[in-house]
Amino acid sequence: MKIIFYFFIIVFTMQLNAQNNYPIVLIHGFMGWGEDEMGEYNYWGGNKSYADMIRESGNTVFELSVGPVSSNWDRAVEAYYQLKGGQVDYGNSHSKKYNIEQKPSNKIYKGLYPQWDENNPIHIIGHSMGGQTARMLQYLLSQEFFINEGTNQKEESNLLGDTHNRWIKSITSISTPHDGTTLTEIVTKTIPFIQYFVGVAGVIGTRFYDFDLDHWRFKMKNNESWTNYLNRMKQHSAWETKNISSWDLSLDGARELNNHLQASADVYYFSIVTSTTE
């Protein structure tokens, strides 16, 4: 799998060089992490860094870090502000609907690519849930959102209050469950939560990894054990809403997303599929 993925990255980069040199944005999937967040172990490449390999070929690469268990809406909003800069704003209407903090005070970014606009577009590569997140970002960029349905009062955020067409040149998804997956049922119900995350906890240590749910007013306490942290997260009310990864990745959740996330005529779409057997 790693060899296939590496080959794809190289071929894709060569094709990009033949046409343009727009930045490449990498969006991780469910339970993923950003650059340097797990020491020398990379989400994109493991012991190697695919991002650095692409950079060596002359391309600009941005590796984002969005909520590992958050919904695609929340992840897409975070992706926008990490690139463009500013304080994350999940939207007035969305925040009230799900009782989350609209503008978390700790989520303010300088911007990896502040000049991002229709004249300076990007290519996005999303792995697993990251492919859904990329499509959600394109959707949010292409629409105007209003604080209340039936009114003409627009959202005040830079992202949601106006349209931003042709900001994305291409979206490539790798192993993305665009139609949902039954795996989420296994993760959230069949397999105990602690068992599922114990491998992650063993790799990253006690303070290295954060589930980034500050907008749900949830964070690891000082000197809190991993076991207690995970148990509290397991019981959090967020899992009972539609504003969470388990819903977006489910069959019903993905179907609901697909009703909104229509393909744009201005974007090139590529999908790399994989399969596995027991």
Identify the role of each PLM range.
Residues 9-12, 84, 233:
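Generic alpha-helical secondary structure signal
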Residues 139-278:
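Helical cap/lid subdomain of alpha/beta-hydrolase-fold lipid enzymes
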Residues 18-176, 180-195:
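N-terminal non-catalytic accessory region
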Residues 1-4, 190:
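Structural motif marking the loop-to-transmembrane transition
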Residues 3-15:
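Sec-dependent N-terminal signal peptides
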Residues 16, 58, 209-211:
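Intrinsic-disorder/low-complexity regions
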